[in-house]
């Protein structure tokens, strides 16, 4: 009999017992000493909720829009690579769960299911494409064109990965894809991170990034991408207000405040702490989203109160996959949805439009006096 899991931490604890160690370590780990990994979650507790009373919360509407597309709730699925390591159906299970729940899924370029397979598995699902900029621009260009052809609704371009962060567990485990898997959006063994490729004796993914991803990425590449596609473009990985303003100048449609799940540069701020500066900097000109550390419905409420349009979750989806595939992902999303609904009700919010910054304040005890 399967255990009864009632919160996101339950799903993670279960995943640790069923996933191969190198796979669990890959999904769980952050960069270096993992200070930011812990802080992404811990930082939410530094923001305190100040609920409104006597607001008639008999009926709660969680729905909103993301880049002009309606979603049932402001909780979407972020790009998580190589999901077939967690469950045989991987990304196909995830997109089906998103379709059922009425929310969106961002597909990783490094998926173990192809752009086309995911579109066919979730034809009615709201799908977005995450993009890395490859040294060979034609590789990135083809990913964008395929996403357009298959009905994906936006491109989320990752800008925080000129090189891969130093993830100690991946080095210790000499992380590679299991032999039966490959990144299915690519044909050649080298681009597909196939076990048949040559990726060294340490972290194979770090070697892959060094071989394939362009470290000379600049704002000119955002212009190139803007010329390439008419789809909305979201820049993923912004943590500074001036970078956010530069992104707006270059014609992006959204900014995803992200530190890559704390997997790139250790010591950067938790995303919830970086969010207010970004929101202020863009002055409402583009939509702002957040990922990193979202584990509870109150986390979602706090992010929206600080100006996020929606949040994206990554690791919780993997833990759901590891538990029960499509149903596990759906259950994880349902938990977050119902926690968010309750948090809204207890805060006096009938719909997402009334969620504003008056609902949250930084705990004064958490502010350094240095």
Swiss-Prot record:
One Pfam family hit: FMN_dh
* Cofactor(s) recorded in Swiss-Prot or TrEMBL: FMN
> Molecular function terms in GO for this entry?
(S)-2-hydroxy-acid oxidase activity; FMN binding; glyoxylate oxidase activity
Record EC number: 1.1.3.15, 1.2.3.5
| SUPFAM superfamilies (UniProt xref) | FMN-linked oxidoreductases
Q: In which pathway does it act?
A: Amino-acid biosynthesis; glycine biosynthesis
Q: What is its main location?
A: other
Its catalytic activity? Answer: a (2S)-2-hydroxycarboxylate + O2 = a 2-oxocarboxylate + H2O2; glycolate + O2 = glyoxylate + H2O2; glyoxylate + O2 + H2O = oxalate + H2O2 + H(+); 2-hydroxyhexadecanoate + O2 = 2-oxohexadecanoate + H2O2
Q: What does UniProt list as catalytic?
A: 260
Under InterPro entries, the record lists: Aldolase_TIM (IPR013785), Alpha-hydoxy_acid_DH_FMN (IPR012133), FMN-dep_DH (IPR000262), FMN_HAD (IPR037396), FMN_hydac_DH_AS (IPR008259)
Modification sites for N6-succinyllysine? 184
Phosphoserine found at: 194, 230
Asked if the Swiss-Prot or TrEMBL record annotates the protein with the keyword Transmembrane helix, the reply is no
Q: Where in the cell is it found?
A: Peroxisome matrix
Record-annotated FMN hydroxy acid dehydrogenase domain positions: 1-365
Single GO biological process annotation from the record: response to oxidative stress
Q: Which residues bind FMN?
A: 79-81, 108, 130, 158, 236, 258, 291-295, 314-315
* Motif Microbody targeting signal: where in chain: 368-370
One Gene Ontology cellular component:
peroxisome
The record lists glyoxylate as bound by 26, 132, 167, 260, 263
Provide this UniProt record's keywords sorted from A to Z.
Answer: Amino-acid biosynthesis, Flavoprotein, FMN, Oxidoreductase, Peroxisome, Phosphoprotein
Briefly, what is this protein's role?
Broad substrate specificity (S)-2-hydroxy-acid oxidase that preferentially oxidizes glycolate. The glyoxylate produced by the oxidation of glycolate can then be utilized by alanine-glyoxylate aminotransferase for the peroxisomal synthesis of glycine; this pathway appears to be an important step for the detoxification of glyoxylate which, if allowed to accumulate, may be metabolized to oxalate with formation of kidney stones. Can also catalyze the oxidation of glyoxylate, and long chain hydroxyacids such as 2-hydroxyhexadecanoate and 2-hydroxyoctanoate.
How does the record describe its quaternary structure?
A: Homotetramer.
Give the protein's recorded name.
2-Hydroxyacid oxidase 1
| Organism of origin | Rattus norvegicus (Rat)
């Amino acid at each position: 009999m399967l255990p009864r899991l009632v919160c996101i931490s339950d799903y993670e604890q279960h995943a640790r017992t069923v996933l191969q160690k190198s796979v669990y370590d890959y999904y769980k780990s952050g960069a270096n000493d993992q200070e930011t990994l812990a802080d992404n979650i811990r930082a939410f507790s530094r923001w305190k909720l100040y609920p409104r009373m006597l607001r008639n919360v008999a009926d709660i509407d969680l729905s909103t829009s993301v880049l002009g597309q309606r979603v049932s709730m402001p909780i979407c699925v972020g790009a998580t690579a190589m999901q077939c390591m967690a469950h045989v159906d991987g990304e196909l299970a995830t997109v089906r769960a998103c379709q059922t729940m009425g929310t969106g899924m961002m597909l990783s370029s490094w998926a173990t299911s192809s752009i086309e397979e995911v579109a066919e598995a979730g034809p009615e699902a709201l799908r977005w494409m995450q993009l890395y900029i490859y040294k060979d621009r034609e590789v990135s260009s083809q990913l964008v064109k395929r996403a357009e052809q298959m009905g994906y609704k936006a491109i989320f371009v990752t800008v925080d990965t000129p090189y891969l962060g130093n993830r100690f567990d991946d080095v210790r485990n000499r992380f590679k894809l299991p032999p039966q898997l490959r990144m299915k959006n690519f044909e050649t063994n080298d681009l597909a991170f196939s076990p048949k490729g040559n990726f060294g004796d340490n972290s194979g993914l770090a070697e892959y990034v060094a071989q394939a991803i362009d470290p000379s990425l600049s704002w000119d590449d955002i212009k190139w991408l803007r010329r390439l596609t008419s789809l909305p473009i979201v820049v993923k990985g912004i943590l500074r207000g001036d970078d956010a303003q530069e992104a707006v100048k270059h014609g992006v449609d959204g900014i995803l405040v992200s530190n890559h799940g704390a997997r790139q540069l250790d010591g950067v701020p938790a995303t919830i702490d970086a969010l207010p500066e970004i929101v202020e900097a863009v002055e409402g000109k583009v939509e702002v989203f957040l990922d990193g550390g979202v584990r509870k419905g109150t986390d979602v409420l706090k992010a929206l109160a600080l100006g996020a349009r929606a949040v994206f979750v990554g690791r919780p989806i993997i833990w759901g996959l590891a538990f029960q595939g499509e149903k596990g992902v759906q259950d994880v999303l349902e938990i977050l949805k119902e926690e968010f609904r309750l948090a809204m009700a207890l805060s006096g919010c009938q719909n997402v439009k009334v969620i504003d910054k008056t609902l949250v304040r930084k705990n004064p005890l958490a502010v350094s006096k240095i």
